């Protein structure tokens, strides 16, 4: 248990940040999962509509440090390639 006021404050801040990060990571995973489901179902229209939304969620996650920049680029690249192949 934290003994000083500043240590208690850091514990509170950490708990708050952990909760925010958990929600953002969950949102990211759900969005990518929905995108992959649309691709698997070969639904070009839905995949096309979800692509910009998914990219936005990925970019925000990378910006806030939920995932690394290169991981975000890799996710976006793979999803874009699959949607492009689906549309062709």
Swiss-Prot record:
GO terms for biological process: translation. Gene3D superfamilies: Ribosomal protein S20. Keywords: Ribonucleoprotein, Ribosomal protein, RNA-binding, rRNA-binding. Pfam families: Ribosomal_S20p. The keyword rRNA-binding applies. GO terms for molecular function: small ribosomal subunit rRNA binding; structural constituent of ribosome. InterPro entries: Ribosomal_bS20 (IPR002583), Ribosomal_bS20_sf (IPR036510). GO terms for cellular component: cytosol; small ribosomal subunit. It comes from the Bacteria. Binds directly to 16S ribosomal RNA. Belongs to the bacterial ribosomal protein bS20 family. This is Small ribosomal subunit protein bS20. It comes from Solibacter usitatus (strain Ellin6076).
């Amino acid at each position: 248990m934290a003994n000083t006021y500043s240590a208690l404050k850091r514990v509170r801040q950490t708990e708050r940040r952990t909760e925010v990060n958990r929600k953002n990571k969950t949102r990211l995973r759900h969005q990518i999962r929905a995108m992959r489901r649309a691709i698997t179902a070969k639904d070009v229209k839905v995949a096309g509509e979800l692509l910009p939304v998914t990219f936005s969620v990925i970019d925000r996650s990378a910006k806030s440090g939920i995932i690394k920049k290169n991981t975000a680029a890799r996710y976006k690249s793979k999803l874009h390639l699959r949607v492009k192949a689906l549309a062709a």
